[in-house]
């Protein structure tokens, strides 16, 4: 109906595939359950807008399986530019690496090489601007707008190339410093911070496939929260921690979400031997003493990830202190204050998640 109404004016309908029925046992399954049977039935001026992951812009998710299940319907990507689940405008988290990871993912829909970048016809971004002079509340948050725009025009670009471009266009080389010294002592350290920042956030928020264990504000942790209104709004619904273990079973013995992916991914995710450890608790419910590739038990590995994330933010603080001669006083102070907040928040996450072990 909507597509027919706008068609005479050259209009298109971008229809979001964000579905979460409260009666479902697994929200990750719902987009495919809703849209796969409708493939090819939409008007020519309709495009289905799919979030990068199957839940909701988490620090790390596998790509949405719906990208591999529509053959006769145009698809577009929905990324999040703002940091709803990644520390708002207080944390240094560069989204370029997240976008690149998703766009380069192989769905195997038409065989090997069926990457998401080759399939999508457009890209949308969920953003949040304010009255701050840089619109974003944090100078480093601007890099996510830039990364989104560059990848929208050319999805083959690397996150590192985009970070290099943004840094050179954002910061001005001080007088009296040679280009070589500026690159070695400022550009490269800032780029290294940006390129590692997403993984740092994953470490101190939700490592090893943890997801949706935020408090109601989506800013801080809330693994104890249990919504009365809807189970699938609750962190306990997703981490499923009990005395026996932790994690969401999406294997063939659980919600069978793995089988919404094409082979070899379905079997890879289903098997503990081949599932990437970065997604382990996304697809598997495991005992606390499960041994990982490091030889450590699961609970010990979880704790080490949180400690590592905090240490990484501490390194950012030390690095930024060395960069004071290269930026204005206002920029230096802003970033220093934000990194202090980020470190405190990382410790908050670690302390809160220690309560998950029953």
Task: Tell me what each language-model feature is.
Residues 1, 356-358:
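Accessible peptide chain termini
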Residues 111-356:
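Catalytic domains of carbohydrate-active enzymes that cleave complex glycans
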Residues 1-164, 170-175:
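Catalytic-core regions of glycoside hydrolase
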């Amino acid at each position: 109906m909507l597509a027919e109404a706008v068609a005479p004016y050259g209009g298109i309908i971008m229809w979001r595939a964000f579905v979460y029925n409260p009666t479902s046992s697994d929200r990750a399954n719902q987009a495919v359950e809703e849209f796969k049977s409708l493939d090819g039935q939409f008007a020519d001026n309709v495009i289905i807008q799919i979030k990068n992951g199957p839940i909701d812009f988490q620090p790390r998710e596998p790509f949405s399986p719906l990208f591999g299940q529509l053959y006769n319907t145009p698809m577009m990507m929905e990324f999040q530019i703002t940091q709803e689940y990644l520390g708002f405008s207080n944390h240094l988290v560069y989204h370029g690496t997240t976008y690149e990871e998703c766009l380069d993912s192989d769905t195997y829909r038409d065989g090997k090489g069926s990457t998401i970048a080759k399939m999508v016809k457009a890209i949308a971004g969920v953003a949040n601007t304010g009255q701050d002079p840089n619109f974003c509340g944090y100078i480093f948050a601007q890099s996510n707008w830039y990364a989104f725009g560059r990848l929208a025009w050319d999805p083959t670009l690397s996150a590192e190339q985009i970070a290099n471009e943004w840094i050179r266009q954002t910061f001005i080389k001080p007088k009296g410093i040679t280009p070589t010294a500026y690159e070695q002592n400022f550009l490269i350290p800032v780029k290294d911070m940006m390129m590692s920042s997403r993984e740092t956030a994953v470490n101190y928020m939700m490592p090893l496939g943890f997801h949706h264990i935020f408090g109601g504000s989506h800013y801080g942790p809330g693994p104890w929260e249990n919504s009365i209104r809807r189970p699938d709004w609750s962190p306990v619904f997703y981490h499923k921690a009990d005395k026996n273990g932790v994690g969401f079973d999406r294997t063939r013995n659980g919600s069978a979400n793995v089988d919404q992916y094409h082979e070899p991914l379905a079997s890879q995710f289903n098997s503990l031997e081949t599932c990437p450890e970065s997604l382990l608790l996304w697809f598997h419910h495991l005992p606390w003493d499960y041994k990982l590739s490091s030889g450590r038990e699961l609970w010990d590995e979880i704790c080490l990830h949180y400690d590592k994330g905090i240490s990484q933010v501490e390194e950012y603080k030390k690095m930024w202190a060395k960069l004071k001669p290269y930026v204005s006083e206002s920029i230096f102070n802003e970033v220093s204050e934000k990194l202090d907040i980020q470190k405190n928040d990382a410790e908050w996450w670690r302390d809160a998640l220690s309560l998950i072990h029953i």
